Amino acid sequence: MSTVNVQIGLHELLNGSNAQIQLSVPQLVEKVLMRNEGKLTSTGAVSASTGKYTGRSPKDKFIVKEASVADKIAWGAVNQPISEEHFNKLYIKVLEYLKEKEELFIFKGFAGADRNYRLPIQVVNEYAWHNLFVHQLFIRPNEEELATHESEFTIVSAPNFKADPAIDGTNSEAFIMVSFEKRIVLIGGTEYAGEMKKSIFSIMNFLLPEQDILSMHCSSNVGEEGDVALFFGLSGTGKTTLSADPNRKLIGDDEHGWSDNGVFNIEGGCYAKCVNLSHEKEPQIFDAIKFGSVLENVVIDGQTRIADYNDTTLTENTRAAYPMHAIDNIVLPSVAGHPNTIIFLTADASGVLPPISKLSKEQAMYHFLSGYTSKLAGTERGVTSPQATFSTCFGSPFLPLDASRYAEMLGEKIEKHDAKVFLVNTGWTGGEYGVGKRMNLGYTRAMIQAALSGELAKAETAKHDIFGLEVPRHVPGVPDEVLMPEQTWADKDAYKVKAIELANEFKENFKKFDSVSEAIINLGGPIA
């Protein structure tokens, strides 16, 4: 099947009598309620459930193995190949399925807040609530932009269409397929809305580096003087909490590009975790959940329609989707200058990494590639040993290219723009998990404040004798002994054993990067 035929099929779908194009937020909310896809909560948000898929389904994600990209993609467990034949046949079936629907919902918008690099996209949805979701998550066009909008990538989403693995070449009924040649994302079998958001991010992680733009899985904010900070970190490291600063404006909470002009948000909204959400802890997110926002898999009281953010009956991965303008203290459009400060956040449950350390360019590239944090394995059975988790570039599931490409670009940009990089441990101190305690949030905030102000750039440091990190000897508002992790352990020998154990896990993980330069390994990694 040719690309021409594919485009004809899509053209027919987009121009069918059932196509509802660019409905407003109130219209979409009405459709959601009329079609019984969700409920209205006490704050006016739409609440929807995603059925059995309450998170991303990485084993069901594929990239079509096409001649134009075959030698560019880092094929493997993350980027699984699927044949053009399988994709084409499944695509035709999905189009035929959607043509029969009473209504389809179509959103046209952009990914990328910098107008020089934005990607015009369109999304075809079987569900009205999914269309409301993409309306809030991507960048919405004004009337003039909509009139001239020509999509360069299309998401076709049919959650109720189930694949047959025996025929369709999939691993299950669910599928998320990207064809770079046909500029199509095909999603079916899963109702989890995050698949649409992350598919576009994966696409941008392929397209932006080709324009010499580093795509990044991070949050970012900007100070009153125009100083920009990036926060990288895996789930549970405090990225959202620490980047929400009343004295700084939010550029974005999750996906960014770094071009020759500076930093820009890829999205037009936020997709925030809301497990245990409270107004006291995270007022910005709490107050954003209002009319037009979408709650995903949050338990709602049947009578009062009040959301119970502590109830994880459906999943711990409860989410809220809302547009950037739903929160105060933001930059619009979501663009800013070059980063002055880059923070890598890790929650080290072994309690051996310093609470803050300065990184050289090589160390920054090493820790960027490593993407380390801890997961607590088996705590429900009383097992207290933490499990080291490494997610390349703090975003392994979304990187189509070889990881070294992103690391090299980061190194070049750090050097060119003299960005200062810090590794911040928000995990344990005074011992590993079960012995020590979680790092004091007030201390972490003080350390980040000192990094952002430029104070730590000139601070006196001591080299960590196992990890080779430069640890500040003094940070205002933080006891000096807290800065040196060994000093917080009662058993100094036990600290050394645990630190060497973690250093070895870093080294073992790094063996997979066979295309990385020797300088990054020799100058960036542990020294013991």
Curated annotation (Swiss-Prot):
GO terms for cellular component: cytosol. It comes from the Bacteria. Its cofactor is Mn(2+). Its main location: cytoplasm. Substrate binds at residues 56, 192, 198, 319. Gene3D superfamilies: 3.90.228.20, Phosphoenolpyruvate Carboxykinase, domain 1, Phosphoenolpyruvate Carboxykinase, domain 2. ATP binds at residues 198, 217, 233-241, 282, 319, 444. InterPro entries: PEP_carboxykinase_ATP, PEP_carboxykinase_C, PEP_carboxykinase_N, PEPCK_ATP_CS. Pfam families: PEPCK_ATP. GO terms for biological process: gluconeogenesis. It catalyses: oxaloacetate + ATP = phosphoenolpyruvate + ADP + CO2. Pathway: Carbohydrate biosynthesis; gluconeogenesis. Binds 1 Mn(2+) ion per subunit. GO terms for molecular function: ATP binding; metal ion binding; phosphoenolpyruvate carboxykinase (ATP) activity. It is found in: Cytoplasm. Its EC number is 4.1.1.49. Mn(2+) binds at residues 198, 217, 254. Keywords: ATP-binding, Cytoplasm, Decarboxylase, Gluconeogenesis, Lyase, Manganese, Metal-binding, Nucleotide-binding. Involved in the gluconeogenesis. Catalyzes the conversion of oxaloacetate (OAA) to phosphoenolpyruvate (PEP) through direct phosphoryl transfer between the nucleoside triphosphate and OAA. HAMAP family: PEPCK_ATP (MF_00453). Belongs to the phosphoenolpyruvate carboxykinase (ATP) family. This is Phosphoenolpyruvate carboxykinase (ATP). It comes from Bacillus mycoides (strain KBAB4). The lineage of its organism: Bacteria, Bacillati, Bacillota, Bacilli, Bacillales.
